[in-house]
């Protein structure tokens, strides 16, 4: 399991996301051979959280980063959220590989503010994500 690599595009696309605020979110997946993490999709800045949720498959695991903007009494805040999506319908081996590789991808994606691990859509509720981020950011 430790042999899974990150494609070069993972860090280059993430750097565009982080430094240039070029995308609202990025979805990453493992290639068909389960040997490398690759970029599956990038979404333009005008994409919504609902668009993001629709891009997470019902029966396959994914990693994702989301550029979350939310209001506080002090003004607008912006945080990069890392997601590990392992839905109930995905295969056990796939869940294990994604969980085992999570530390590798997180190490490459510098500047993450929070992590959300979810197995069903209810755990991805935007209000709950924002509440978690606010708690961490205090």
Curated annotation (Swiss-Prot):
<dbReference type="InterPro" id="IPR002108">
    <property type="entry name" value="ADF-H"/>
</dbReference>
<comment type="subunit">
    <text>Interacts with F-actin. Does not interact with G-actin. Interacts with 14-3-3 protein 3.</text>
</comment>
<dbReference type="GO" id="GO:0031143">
    <property type="term" value="C:pseudopodium"/>
</dbReference>
<dbReference type="GO" id="GO:0031234">
    <property type="term" value="C:extrinsic component of cytoplasmic side of plasma membrane"/>
</dbReference>
<dbReference type="GO" id="GO:0030042">
    <property type="term" value="P:actin filament depolymerization"/>
</dbReference>
<keyword id="KW-1003">Cell membrane</keyword>
<dbReference type="GO" id="GO:0051014">
    <property type="term" value="P:actin filament severing"/>
</dbReference>
<dbReference type="GO" id="GO:0051015">
    <property type="term" value="F:actin filament binding"/>
</dbReference>
<protein>
    <recommendedName>
        <fullName>Actophorin</fullName>
    </recommendedName>
</protein>
<feature type="domain" description="ADF-H">
    <location>
        <begin position="3"/>
        <end position="134"/>
    </location>
</feature>
<keyword id="KW-0009">Actin-binding</keyword>
<keyword id="KW-0206">Cytoskeleton</keyword>
<dbReference type="InterPro" id="IPR029006">
    <property type="entry name" value="ADF-H/Gelsolin-like_dom_sf"/>
</dbReference>
<dbReference type="InterPro" id="IPR017904">
    <property type="entry name" value="ADF/Cofilin"/>
</dbReference>
<comment type="function">
    <text>Actin-binding protein that severs actin filaments.</text>
</comment>
<keyword id="KW-0472">Membrane</keyword>
<dbReference type="Pfam" id="PF00241">
    <property type="entry name" value="Cofilin_ADF"/>
</dbReference>
<keyword id="KW-0963">Cytoplasm</keyword>
<dbReference type="GO" id="GO:0015629">
    <property type="term" value="C:actin cytoskeleton"/>
</dbReference>
<keyword id="KW-0966">Cell projection</keyword>
<dbReference type="GO" id="GO:0005737">
    <property type="term" value="C:cytoplasm"/>
</dbReference>
<comment type="similarity">
    <text>Belongs to the actin-binding proteins ADF family.</text>
</comment>
<dbReference type="GO" id="GO:0001891">
    <property type="term" value="C:phagocytic cup"/>
</dbReference>
